[in-house]
Amino acid sequence: MLQGYSSVSQALLGTFFTWAMTAAGAALVFIFSSGQRRILDGSLGFAAGVMLAASYWSLLAPAVEMATSSGGFGAFAFFPVAVGFTLGAAFVYLADLLMPHLGAGEDPQTALALNLDPALVKKSDLKDPASLLFPERELSIRIDKRENGEVYQRKKLAATDFPEGAAPSGPVHGNSGQPGVSSWRRIALLILAITIHNIPEGLAVGVGFGAVEKTASATFESARNLAIGIGIQNFPEGLAVSLPLRGAGFSTWKAFWYGQLSGMVEPLAGVFGAFAVVLAEPVLPYALAFAAGAMVYVVMDDIIPEAQISGNGKLASWASILGFVVMMSLDVGLG
């Protein structure tokens, strides 16, 4: 994120920074235990606040200004922003719906739904850690989407409760506590799911740098602050992946590897976003709003619910307020 370079180069630098922050967050698995849920929930709340503020000041505000200054929409300058915002949210929603068809089970809640309670995990389950990532039964209070992917329902089932007439399906055991072949497929699906949810963040950084100097509010400082903000919120996201994996029985190094892996897609999405807006400037309002809509949907659909389900809701809420204020200050004060 150095001035004087092309938009694509800036996007690449910015998204490498956000990936590095994801890896740094995942590295905390070497320090914290899987039982320290308050730290994770507070961090997720902070990340939610940062993303919401970044979505407005770094993406939606420039999009509205571009649509207005173009003069082609008149009183309907809100239209491209509204369309782009809705399409961004729809992209993540449809990605969620696609996951069950790839074999990820019935639950499309994939981004941060790794809420494992170590006190409820049996030793026998640790023979196949990956089977805990997509359990057939609930081991703790967590978010459960209905089949249409729209309605949340909190529920707490005993580890021995199963649907009427259904028998528990046995896990596929590997050797020495390592996941079996089908379990590795589940891990791959998990990483794919989290990666899909990281695309909007990388896209937002790329679009932000691609839009520099297109309007008064689309400045290098604004794009830089957006990258910093997304990097800040990526920090707890890395921990949100690695910590539950460690609690599920994976080695510390494997938990770290899978945690940082989720951020690898951001440089690719960032470069794509920068190229897109440089080559097709008229789509800028749509692109900025698309990135904002996708980010807001991830916050509302994944991060906030996940931070609320372990009894630390107030902490997460105040942390989100703090995150919003910090990101707002970065954009307004340093923009």
Swiss-Prot record:
Gene Ontology BP annotations: zinc ion import across plasma membrane; zinc ion transmembrane transport
GO MF entries: copper ion transmembrane transporter activity; zinc ion transmembrane transporter activity
GO cellular component: cytoplasm; Golgi apparatus; membrane; nucleus; plasma membrane
Main localisation: membrane
Localization: Cell membrane; Nucleus; Cytoplasm; Golgi apparatus
Entry keywords, A to Z: Cell membrane, Cytoplasm, Golgi apparatus, Ion transport, Membrane, Nucleus, Transmembrane, Transmembrane helix, Transport, Zinc, Zinc transport
Record field: catalytic activity: Zn(2+)(in) = Zn(2+)(out); Cu(2+)(in) = Cu(2+)(out)
Lipid bilayer topology: Multi-pass membrane protein
Entry similarity comment: Belongs to the ZIP transporter (TC 2.A.5) family.
Protein name, entry field: Zinc transporter ZIP11
Organism: Rattus norvegicus
Encoding gene per record: Slc39a11
